[in-house]
Amino acid sequence: MESNKSSSHGDVSTSPSFLNNHHQFNNGGDIIPKKKKNRIMHVGSYEVGKTLGNGTFGKVKLGTNICTKENVAIKFIKNNKLSGKQKETCFREIDIMKLLDHPNIVKLLDVVDKREEEGTTYLIVEYVSGGELFDYIVAREYIKEKEARKFFRQMISAIEYCHANLIVHRDLKPENLLLDSNGDIKISDFGLSNNIQPGKLLESFCGSPLYAAPEILKAEKYLGPPVDIWSLGVIMYAVLCGNLPWEGDSQAEISFNSVHGNYEDPTHLSAEAVHILRRMIVPNPKDRATIQELKNHPWTNIDYQEIPKSHLPPRDAVHEIKEDIFAHLISLGFPNTKETRDIILKNENCGIVNVYHLLLDRYASKEVENLKSKLELLSKRKKSFSDKRNPSTNSLASIPEDSNDLSSNNNNNQQQQNSPPSKTNSSSTSSSNRESNNNSPSQGSIKEISLDELDNHIEQLDNDIENSDNNKSSSLTRRSSDPNKDIENSLKAQGLFSSYSAPGVPNSDHNYDFETYQQQQQYQQQLHQQQLQLQQQYQSQIQSDISFPHDDVEIESYSIQQQQLQQQQQQQQEQHKEDNNKPNTNLRRNSIAVSTFMEDEPNEMPINNLYKMNEQIQQQPIIGGSGNVMRSQFNQTLPTIDQQPVIEAPKTRRMSLDSRMLNGDQQSLVEKNQHMASPRTSKGIFKSSTTTTKSPEKTIIELKRSLEESGLFTKKKGPYLFLCFDEDNSVKFQIEIVKICNLDLTGIQLKRLSGDTWKYKDICTELVESMKL
């Protein structure tokens, strides 16, 4: 695009190319800047929507499946902005999430890798609409033991599942614990997770200092599972108490208490709750509780009949190790020894066996998907092969039913005579292949079939299709000097005929009356002459500029000409209907009737009708921006009889804004405004920080008053949405007024966007308490 240079007077360049690219003109010649089109981005089969937040490696946007309309979360990973260590961490997260399948873990649905084209990798993950557990805590100040026990059991189940598969999370905190629409926990963000290698210690410093175990803060080598147990204990303390266990006047004092596990027991909790917290928040990892102890703790199973499920599927023993899966297992860091193979074959209850079975399940699912795609490709190839062997009917022509077998036999005889013996053999081979294809898994009963056999099957079908195309093309190599005859002959070879010609008469049909054929030829010539006259009159009217007559004489002559045209067309229709009503036993069923210039039945519309419809559509008045009525000129003339007609769909005119408003967009615009005039509806009250019986309008007034008194920087993002920022603490969050579904209540939802979590909690608590609800 050319750069816009400014002249000495500061005017922007108005070159024709610039104006054409960036502006459009109205009737008065004024420049109207073009509106930017909202381009919809697609990633795979998902439509990208609004931004949900920022993840560890990039933005997270809402996605919608084009077919199922299911919502997903799409993580954008810009590979060129990641360091070598970050790339390793990122793709390790992808490998780990591919292996996990647990109801309380966010599921990775798909990976769209476009590193070579766009330098971006897209992770399609499960969309969790309930927000963070931390926001849920802020909304209630703290959570009662009964509800906290439900969350705890779900977290134990997910963590045990990870540890059993030799995966440690290492970054458990309330911000990475999400709530779905049913209020269940979903563990997310496995960016800092790692594989637990038997006999090896981890040494990476990672996680949040407030939730990290003492061995990580002291930069010691550590085991994986005890680290997650410590973080789980700190999370449960925050859930039950609404604040962290570490207190102090300075950051150094807080860090000291965190490393040594110094905290006071909350007085409002039961003895069982205090005890289970003390078993998890233990500085020495060797003395810290295990998952099995927590599952069987009395507090965990109050009001429950059984301990939390791990959702580990039963594993059958394997009798043979697949080398490709074993190589993948070794790439994850497991030892390549005979002992590892023996453990897998013995099916011992250990992490190596679980990881091997996870990889085995993953490879099996891939093979199933490949098999499905191969079967779909096979069915498509077979369909295209049958379509080429048996050409279907045209929208303007149909093959007579009585001549199907006869015409196909004639075509086959011609192909066998003109083709060499090798091609004849290939055709017989293809027929045998088609018989064998009827027993394929795509049509008959499901049989065991390998991918190699499917590939050979598809390759054979391709050869058959190519041979059939060569046979068809060789039968049409001879062409006469007349191009119209060439077209007619090629159509007759397939049983199809031009819409200007009479019904085709194959040479082998002796039942067809020759006198009837001559009568139809004469009738065809008469129709052609009448159509030529109408075309000449119509073209002369176009050339004489009949745009809207201004004088009365011109209006009268114009109306007379239109009446004459209509009378001639009506006469043609009546004459054609009389001819059609005459009984004729020699005519075949479903033969191609010669259509008149204005046919009533849409299924037998001639080509001239399509051009006529095109002209009528283009001549309809279009409401412009100034309200004037305009006429569009014809860009193409009607085809003559000698020309082979090219069938085109009628061009639909682009509707102006006024005409769209008249056609119903105005009502949708009103409905949209009505939707914006009311607050969003929220399912349940657990997402709201507080509720009130006041109307949304009165709640807005009270919220504005509290925001003015708080001194927060506030920006209104919508009728019921506010963006708030605390400059002192660098905390950014949003407040939204919602309607509670099925309840006559108004809710206030708070969501942290950035900044320290516990400073955000203090600000929100103070703000909600100042509101008189």
UniProtKB/Swiss-Prot annotation:
Any GO BP: intracellular signal transduction
GO molecular function term, any single one: ATP binding
Coiled-coil residue spans: 362-390, 445-474
Keywords per UniProt = ATP-binding, Coiled coil, Kinase, Nucleotide-binding, Serine/threonine-protein kinase, Transferase
Superkingdom per UniProt: Eukaryota
Q: Enumerate the residue ranges of region (Disordered).
A: 1-32, 382-445, 462-487, 558-588
Q: Which residues form the active site?
A: D171
Query: What positions does the entry give for ATP binding?
Result: L52, G53, N54, G55, T56, F57, G58, K59, V60, K75
Bias kind Low complexity: ranges: 405-443, 561-573
Which intervals hold domain Protein kinase?
46-300
Q: What is its EC number?
A: 2.7.11.1
* Catalytic activities: L-seryl-[protein] + ATP = O-phospho-L-seryl-[protein] + ADP + H(+); L-threonyl-[protein] + ATP = O-phospho-L-threonyl-[protein] + ADP + H(+)
Q: Where is the composition biased (Polar residues)?
A: 1-27, 468-478
User: Which intervals hold domain KA1?
Assistant: 724-773
Query: So what family is this one in?
Result: Belongs to the protein kinase superfamily. CAMK Ser/Thr protein kinase family. SNF1 subfamily.
Name recorded for this polypeptide: Probable serine/threonine-protein kinase MARK-C
Q: Which gene encodes it?
A: mrkC
